[in-house]
A protein has these predicted regions:
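Conserved small/polar residues in nucleotide/adenosyl-binding loops
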Residues: 120-123
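Long amphipathic alpha-helix in the N-terminal Rossmann-like dinucleotide-binding domain
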Residues: 51-56, 112-116
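Generic non-transmembrane alpha-helix signal with a bias for helix starts/N-cap capping motifs
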Residues: 8, 62, 104-105
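An N-terminal boundary/leader segment
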Residues: 1-50
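Immediate post-signal peptide segment of exported/extracytoplasmic ligand-binding proteins
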Residues: 58-74
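Non-membrane alpha-helical structural segments and their capping/turn regions in soluble enzymes
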Residues: 23, 52, 105-108
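Enzymes and membrane/adaptor proteins characterized by extended Gly/Ser/Thr/Asp/Glu-rich
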Residues: 70-110, 114
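Secretory-pathway/luminal and periplasmic proteins that interact with or process carbohydrate-rich
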Residues: 34-39, 64, 83-89
């Protein structure tokens, strides 16, 4: 079965059982994005470097057996109407906004607390 066809629950089990690293999973999503980005154009904001940095941090925490959140190391995409301090949020507007918000929406706070890696914002 293809990696990106697995459910979040299946991916989390593979991460927990150390059959997969967060870096490997994020690289699979990056590869998928690069393959289809030109035609799909569904990504408003994408920071590959930050994503891989967060994934590496998650993998290192897993190796050190630190207390892990329920979504630890799982890449999660956000809709562009959800405010996040890590990425510009356009709230669906067609204007180009370069500035990031200072605040995270409550759902973003909860995702981060659970250990998720923010993948990108989608249109």
């Amino acid at each position: 079965m293809k990696l990106l066809n697995l459910s979040a629950q299946q991916l989390l089990k593979k991460l927990k059982d150390k059959q997969l690293t967060s870096v490997e999973l994020c690289k699979a999503y990056i590869k998928q994005k690069k393959k289809y980005d030109k035609n799909v154009q569904a990504w408003e904001y994408f920071n590959e470097k930050k994503l891989l940095s967060d994934a590496k941090k998650s993998d290192n925490q897993r190796k050190k057996l630190k207390s892990l959140g329920v979504l630890h190391g799982l890449p999660v995409a956000l809709k562009d109407i959800i405010s996040t301090s890590e990425m510009p949020t356009k709230y669906g507007a067609r204007i180009k906004l370069k500035k990031k918000n200072n605040l995270d929406a409550k759902i973003v706070e909860l995702l981060k607390k659970a250990g998720a890696c923010l993948l990108y914002t989608s249109d």
